[in-house]
């Protein structure tokens, strides 16, 4: 009976949602006009641009711009779906002029596309172009040629368009008053999308670039097809693929950026030139960086772009918002949950109505009072509350190491044993999966998924505290400080921060809790919620520029940063740390032999014994940002 009621409620909500979408579509058609234009850049290349203009001529309107490599479709006369399928519709109700542009070399725009095109600081000629100069030229043309605009421009974008928003902020155009990079691609070697601390995120990279990276010899409205996967189990597909050399053969020879990845296995000047933070100096517009605590793609980018702007531009209007979201979830209609974890309210709608729209309204329309947002508006999972801070990381944190102990314990006290370690055998032929389920596409929910499946494996070390007697709140970056020894010459180290729920835990509406494949409610009692996980390719432990082998069986330090956290471990819960040496097929497998992994043969892959030391001299620990 309960399931029937839930089904009826779902169907009723679906009908209401579709009815609202139809109403929004009709309203936009009645109140907006669309035209498509080519805007010339300083080097003569023309960029295809869709412009949606309010019919209301009673006042001048601000311009909100989005530059994208993902197409400004629909092309031609149709337009309503673009403006009503997300929170664009709210800006239509505010009578914004909406401008969406295909970036250079993509879709209907002319020119050559370059991935994360490097910023040119000192431009000396018209051929010195980058995404900042293209944005400048587009804005300049728009404010001079679009009728009835008020001369104020804002730019925002999510993910790769977040990168173009970042570059817009560096354009220096005086009409650009407000910019919001959201889940911005910032650093593709250290933490965003395709590499994390030098480890290659092969699953995202291969599935994305097999389509996105295909050559586009001339402007087109037709998107490329992706790879034809014959195996729909991603673990099995990448295991059978074997090596990155084999993936390269599957990808073929036509995708330029894929070949460039292989040609630059270390953090060299080629990668450094593509660090978006290089452009974040002398920033003039008001900045609002937005990201998700559980963003699988660009969590790193949001945290670290904000910090770079803050450091390199003291005193400017630079704000940060981080909510409990997957990639771009804040632009959806629903932010009440992510995967199995519930947040107690519609966090996405709250953000749209209370932060983003008022931000642009004030700076572009002069509407309302100065939103005067807190420096950082951060949602804390665990307690499910928003908090405001005058700086990030907060001033009132204490970076406290929590130490691994014998018998799988965790303690704030340094271990006293003269010699103690825990070990496991890491076998590349049987890598640790990143999630329990069998599936094809990489899931978004792995970022807060249940880790009980990993706790049961012999190649995963698990350490946990006693039951907490009081709440423990973490706010800021986490540092893994490991003392390790290995029998090979290279290894990966995956560190996972986990919230262990009480055995009797359930949500009030647990009957409707999302289940695994096959239906049914998911058992939340004893849930091991991933709060933050990160991987470190061991050969980069001393330098990302110059990798170095391990000396077999020698104790060495492996210290690396995890992206910031904002989480409260509630009284009655436990804090758990898991350590493992594969995270498959999320990250490529380490052969556990010091080689160029992009060129490794299957014969290079070998088992290794990994030891994590926890004694008085070699005290492995995790440094946690504890709110005092």
Q: Which residues make up each language-model segment?
A:
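Alpha/beta-hydrolase fold nucleophile elbow
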Residues: 147-159
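Conserved alpha/beta-hydrolase "acid-adjacent" motif
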Residues: 296-303
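Cap/lid segment of the alpha/beta-hydrolase catalytic domain
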Residues: 59-145, 194, 332-343, 502-504, ...
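C-terminal, loop-rich substrate-recognition/catalytic regions characterized by aromatic stacking residues
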Residues: 229-232, 238-245, 321, 330, ...
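Short beta-strand/loop motif that positions the catalytic acidic residue
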Residues: 283, 289-291
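N-terminal cap/lid segment of alpha/beta-hydrolase-fold proteins
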Residues: 22-57, 464-470, 550
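Accessory cap/linker subdomain of secreted extracellular hydrolases
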Residues: 84-85, 93, 115-118, 125-128, ...
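Bacterial Sec-dependent N-terminal signal peptides
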Residues: 1-22
């Amino acid at each position: 009976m309960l399931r029937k009621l839930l089904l009826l409620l779902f169907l009723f909500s679906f009908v209401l949602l579709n009815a609202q979408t139809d109403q929004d579509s009709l309203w936009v058609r009645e109140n907006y006009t669309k035209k498509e234009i080519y805007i010339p850049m300083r080097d003569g290349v023309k960029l295809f641009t869709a412009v949606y203009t309010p019919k209301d001529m009673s006042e001048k309107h601000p311009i909100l711009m989005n530059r994208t490599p993902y197409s400004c479709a629909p092309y031609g006369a149709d337009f309503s779906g673009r403006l009503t399928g997300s929170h664009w519709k709210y800006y239509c109700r505010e009578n914004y002029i909406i401008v969406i542009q295909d970036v250079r070399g993509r879709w209907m725009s002319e020119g050559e596309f370059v991935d994360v095109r490097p910023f040119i600081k000192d431009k000396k000629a018209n051929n010195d172009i980058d995404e900042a100069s293209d944005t400048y030229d587009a804005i300049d043309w728009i404010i001079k040629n679009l009728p009835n605009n008020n001369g104020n421009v804002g730019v925002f974008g999510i993910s790769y368009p977040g990168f173009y928003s970042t570059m817009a902020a560096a354009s220096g155009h005086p009409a650009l008053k407000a910019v919001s990079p959201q889940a911005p691609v910032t650093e593709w070697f250290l933490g965003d999308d395709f590499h994390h601390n030098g480890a290659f995120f092969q699953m995202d990279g291969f599935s994305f670039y097999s389509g996105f990276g295909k050559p586009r010899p001339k402007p087109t409205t037709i998107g490329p097809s992706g790879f034809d996967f014959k195996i729909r189990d991603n673990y099995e597909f990448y295991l059978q693929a074997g090596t990155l050399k084999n993936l390269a053969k599957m990808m073929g020879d036509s995708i330029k950026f894929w070949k460039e990845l292989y040609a630059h296995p270390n953090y060299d000047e080629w990668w450094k030139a593509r660090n978006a933070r290089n452009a974040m100096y002398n920033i003039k517009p008001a900045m609002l960086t937005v990201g998700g605590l559980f963003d699988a793609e660009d969590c790193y980018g949001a945290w670290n772009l904000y910090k770079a702007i803050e450091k390199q531009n003291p005193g400017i209007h630079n704000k940060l918002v981080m909510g409990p979201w997957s990639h771009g979830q804040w632009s959806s209609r629903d932010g009440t949950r992510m995967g199995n974890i519930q947040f107690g309210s519609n966090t996405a709608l709250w953000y749209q109505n209370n932060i983003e729209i008022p931000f642009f309204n004030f700076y572009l329309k002069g509407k309302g009072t100065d939103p005067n947002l807190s420096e950082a508006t951060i949602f804390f999972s665990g307690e499910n509350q928003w908090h405001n801070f005058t700086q990030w990381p907060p001033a009132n944190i204490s970076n406290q190491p929590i130490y691994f102990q014998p018998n799988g314990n965790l303690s704030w006290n340094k271990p006293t044993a003269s010699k103690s370690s825990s070990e496991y055998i890491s076998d590349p032929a049987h890598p640790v999966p990143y999630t329990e389920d069998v599936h094809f596409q990489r899931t978004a929910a792995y970022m807060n998924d249940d880790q009980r499946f990993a706790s049961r494996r012999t190649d995963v070390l698990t350490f946990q505290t006693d039951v907490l007697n009081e709440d423990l709140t973490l706010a800021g970056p986490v540092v893994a400080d490991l003392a390790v020894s290995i029998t090979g010459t290279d290894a990966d180290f995956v560190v996972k921060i986990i919230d262990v729920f009480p055995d009797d835990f359930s949500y009030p509406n647990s009957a409707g809790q999302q289940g695994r494949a096959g239906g049914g409610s998911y058992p939340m009692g004893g849930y091991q919620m991933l709060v933050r996980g990160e991987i470190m390719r061991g050969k980069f432990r001393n330098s990302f520029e110059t990798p170095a082998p391990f000396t077999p069986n020698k104790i060495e330090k492996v210290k690396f940063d995890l992206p910031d956290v904002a989480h409260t471990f509630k009284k009655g819960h436990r804090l758990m740390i898991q350590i493992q040496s594969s995270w498959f097929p999320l990250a490529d497998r380490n052969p556990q032999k010091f080689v160029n992994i992009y060129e490794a043969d299957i014969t290079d892959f070998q088992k290794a014994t990994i030891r994590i030391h926890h004694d008085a001299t070699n005290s492995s620990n995790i440094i946690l940002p504890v709110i005092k």
